[in-house]
């Protein structure tokens, strides 16, 4: 049994070698010749999986180690009788922590408290729900918009997108990309929406590039609209609008979900799905794969305020480490993908063990996802 795995899927070689012969291949462009005798294909979001790639090939199963699936033609796979699995929620924590790192940087730079801001969350799936929970744990007001979930009657106080635009100081997008249909998200943030944002608002896109109309956004920024922008995703990736990059406050190369934990979850989820598919069901404990974190433990004295939280968050991950490299190489062919391929190891907040002498600080840090304990001062 021959299994092709994306070369940037951590732990894929070791795990899938339990099931067959493993060959690691680049995801963009994928070497088509390798598909001629392969039984399974494990990809990431950079690989377009469709009829033109797989027609006439012996592939029986496709797994994507990503939460999003808009790069996969699921309907064609089903029609062709090819098994499929994604990894829903695998990088949700990573994306939430990316948003926090960005907001805390902007708050420090511009001198505001997040408690004074209302955050509008567009898309309340695995990422949006976790973001809501962490923001509300800090006492920060949130507004939720998710028309599909509202129409299904899912639990939640869902508001219209127009209301979020009118009331939110921070608008952050966490939707799939739907190019048509009743819940179309292509250019959901169009010129009209962008112009309607509150003066000084913060716009964040960490889902799919085309959810925000990049041309319209650049037009508004060039005309002097007072707006802070965080973009991790871009229309036309791996190409991007270099002029737009110069105008945004934070720009990164589609790495919001790139924690080691998130990548490992993606790999293990598709490994478990494929092992079940072939009748050799296996389970992998994530903590048996992950290395020891760079910072083993830290002691925190006193309560948790915003400056202290910012220091803890940026100790684990400071978004500026990914902004600067992109600006240096933007526009150079191949460099966007190279930044992603050679991405520095990044951990989640849970990797940091925090000893607190304040019980409320320990409790709050646990709610935020840190590994915190209360040890009273002696």
Curated annotation (Swiss-Prot):
GO terms for cellular component: cytosol. It catalyses: 4-phospho-D-erythronate + NAD(+) = (R)-3-hydroxy-2-oxo-4-phosphooxybutanoate + NADH + H(+). InterPro entries: D-isomer_2_OHA_DH_cat_dom, D-isomer_DH_CS, D-isomer_DH_CS1, D-isomer_DH_NAD-bd, Erythronate-4-P_DHase, Erythronate-4-P_DHase_dimer, NAD(P)-bd_dom_sf, PdxB_dimer_sf. NAD(+) binds at residues 146, 175, 232, 257. Its EC number is 1.1.1.290. The keyword Cytoplasm applies. It is found in: Cytoplasm. SUPFAM superfamilies: Formate/glycerate dehydrogenase catalytic domain-like, NAD(P)-binding Rossmann-fold domains. It comes from the Bacteria. Substrate binds at residues 45, 66, 258. It is an enzyme of class 1 (oxidoreductase). The active site is at residues 208, 237, 254. PROSITE patterns: D_2_HYDROXYACID_DH_1, D_2_HYDROXYACID_DH_3. Pfam families: 2-Hacid_dh (PF00389), 2-Hacid_dh_C (PF02826), DUF3410 (PF11890). Keywords: Cytoplasm, NAD, Oxidoreductase, Pyridoxine biosynthesis. GO terms for biological process: 'de novo' pyridoxal 5'-phosphate biosynthetic process; pyridoxine biosynthetic process. One of its GO terms (molecular function) is protein dimerization activity. The keyword ATP-binding does not apply. Homodimer. Belongs to the D-isomer specific 2-hydroxyacid dehydrogenase family. PdxB subfamily. This is Erythronate-4-phosphate dehydrogenase. The gene is pdxB.
């Amino acid at each position: 049994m021959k299994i092709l795995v994306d070369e940037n899927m951590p732990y894929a070689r070791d795990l899938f070698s339990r099931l067959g012969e493993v060959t690691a291949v680049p995801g963009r462009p994928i070497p088509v010749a390798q598909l001629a005798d392969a039984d399974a294909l494990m990809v990431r979001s950079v690989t377009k999986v469709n009829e033109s790639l797989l027609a006439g090939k012996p592939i029986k199963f496709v797994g994507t180690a990503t939460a999003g699936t808009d790069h996969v033609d699921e309907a064609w796979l089903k029609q062709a009788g090819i098994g499929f699995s994604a990894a829903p929620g695998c990088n949700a924590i990573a994306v939430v922590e990316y948003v926090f790192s960005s907001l805390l940087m902007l708050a420090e730079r511009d001198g505001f408290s997040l408690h004074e801001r209302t955050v509008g969350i567009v898309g309340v799936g695995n990422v949006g729900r976790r973001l809501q929970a962490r923001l509300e744990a800090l006492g920060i007001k949130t507004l939720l918009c998710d028309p599909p979930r509202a129409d299904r009657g899912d639990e939640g106080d869902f508001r219209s997108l127009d209301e979020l635009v009118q009331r939110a100081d921070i608008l952050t997008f966490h939707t799939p990309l739907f190019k048509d249909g009743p819940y179309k998200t292509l250019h959901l943030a169009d010129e009209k929406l962008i112009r309607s944002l509150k003066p000084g608002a913060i716009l964040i896109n960490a889902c799919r590039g085309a959810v925000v109309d990049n041309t319209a956004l650049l037009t508004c920024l060039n005309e002097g609209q007072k707006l802070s922008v965080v973009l991790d995703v871009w229309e036309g990736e791996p190409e991007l609008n270099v002029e737009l990059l110069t105008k945004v406050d934070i720009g990164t190369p589609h790495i919001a979900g790139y924690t080691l934990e998130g990548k490992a979850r993606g790999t293990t989820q598709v490994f478990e799905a494929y092992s079940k598919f072939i009748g050799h069901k296996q389970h992998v404990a994530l903590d048996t794969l992950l290395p020891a974190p760079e910072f083993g433990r830290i002691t925190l004295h006193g309560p948790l305020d915003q400056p202290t939280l910012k220091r803890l968050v940026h100790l684990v991950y400071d978004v500026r480490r990914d902004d600067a490299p992109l600006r240096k190489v933007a526009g150079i062919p191949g460099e966007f993908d190279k930044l992603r391929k050679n991405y520095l190891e990044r951990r989640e907040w849970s990797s940091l063990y925090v000893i607190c002498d304040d019980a409320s600080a320990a409790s709050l840090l646990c709610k935020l996802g840190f590994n915190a304990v209360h040890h009273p001062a002696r």
